Amino acid sequence: MSSKCSNCDCSDSSQCTKKGYSFDLVIVETENRSMDTVIMDAPAAENGGNCKCGPSCACVDCKC
């Protein structure tokens, strides 16, 4: 059974990446000072701008 992942059929929708950029906020506290770090990942490859699937997704070469 497959589930719909954006415009791409994937066996597990949790394995598919989201469109655009993703941001993670990491706050590290050591002794009396804190440091905030923002990590930005580049978007995954798209198929005609309609479909994104992560490398472990069953539909890595889906046709959208």
UniProtKB/Swiss-Prot annotation:
The keyword Metal-binding applies. One of its GO terms (molecular function) is zinc ion binding. Signal peptide: none annotated. Keywords: Metal-binding, Metal-thiolate cluster. It comes from the Eukaryota. Metallothioneins have a high content of cysteine residues that bind various heavy metals. Belongs to the metallothionein superfamily. Type 15 family. This is Metallothionein-like protein 1. It comes from Prunus avium. The lineage of its organism: Eukaryota, Viridiplantae, Streptophyta, Embryophyta, Tracheophyta. The gene is MT1.
